[in-house]
């Protein structure tokens, strides 16, 4: 009898406590259950060349979005040289992050990616239709859908030391590939300073060599994705140019540089010029302003055979949502909302991240004309037409799975290395390179 009354009293007290607590919300009684019910969003992102940008992305963009959307957002920063391997590991396991952000078009993973057309549609209402660079970098020609979402790119201008080039009568720097070769040859003879173009199997080496081939009309694949390389004289001509440039003005280090090697060489004044995203110059401005004042920018070198001024993007920032993502809806919304921070992203990247959607940074040209860190302030105005001279990886076609495998496997740097080391002639290197390209194309067809 006593036990029964005691039991009823305890139960009654518990109900009173529970009812009273309910006025303060459901998290009061069950904190573990509340935390478990919170949505999560997992992001893997390539490591930006300027670490402060990633700090802002993690501590401001991701954190604020998570707070506003009741979502726990985690961001893992992945070194550029490890991005492809990490992505393959996740794709194979069908497990990992919700969003994977690449510094290039992730066409190789289109089968594991959702269709991103909806994300582009979400952005279109505020910032306009998808831009050409984004379209050609993320469209799958077979499925007619987008395998990723592109929001910014990094142009690849020429960086050169004005005082060095003034020594050979070119204070404004070389304007085409033949003045780069001639001036570079004289500079090495006179000052012992070599050309600083990257030829190694790195991101910058790939971009540099793919750009030279494209500028010489030595296209790897045609607009339909068929192998075109070595089917005309352009390929051998381009390779012979690279060979002459290396022999007359280069150095053995160009073939062995690790990621960022060309930047380190420039900052040490060991080279006279290099092609790179402006992270090179921004790094110089931060570490040694006097050194940075001697570095000038130039639009890409003028190509041959009416190719004009052109250079492939050093980075095409592409975000991919996996089919196995646990929070696809949140991932789509995050990417659509990310565009709203493009203006601040441009500032946090010190101008490295050029907007694919012009409306997001409408005063871009004014910013380039008067940069607060540049000496002189108008130094960056050379980039005002960057969107016009920056085609997509894969041009004249799209960034196809085959092209991106050719790119990411460093087929071109390896082909060039065999020639520069004397293992193959330019003709044999072109032929063997074309055969490797054909094997990759056949694999994807």
What are these model-derived regions, one by one?
Residues 279-290, 304-410:
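C-terminal lobe and pocket-closing loops
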Residues 102-156, 296-298, 375, 379:
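Hinge/lid segment of periplasmic solute-binding proteins
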Residues 183-186, 225-256, 300:
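Glycine-centered hinge/linker elements that transmit conformational signals in sensory
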